[in-house]
Amino acid sequence: MPLEIDEVQLAAIATSRALGIKRNTSKQMDQFMEQLGEYGIIIDPVADNEWLHITKAMCHNRVIRMPESLYTRICDGEPEAIFIFFHELGHLMLGHQTYLHYSDIEPTQQEDAEWQADEYSKTILSKMGISYMPEQLNLRFL
């Protein structure tokens, strides 16, 4: 679904208010992730040797899966790891569904679920006082 940047940012701000995200949340990410269970969102760390490493993390049906090493980095407060976590949470909160883009025409920026999730994550990290700019990954299927 196409979303303008202000719509994505408003969704992220609403989430941060509802979940009580503050500047010190990055120091308590283990507790924060645990509390998401109260909202029906499950965090599922997977043993690193069982993780397929085709993606850094993934979400589906209110479950965010990630390798244990990423979970540990999130708990340690690493900005990149926290960005990845909120990127995945953004997919859930913005109602993204997993699908492939079947068209000869590239999706617009507003239609790009990855761009939306990045902007969502950047907005929340900004509320936490974290400045992190990710490298955008583009997957091209031939």
Language-model-detected regions and their locations in the chain:
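Active-site hotspot residues in diverse enzymes, especially metal/ion-binding acidic/histidine motifs
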Residues: 1-142
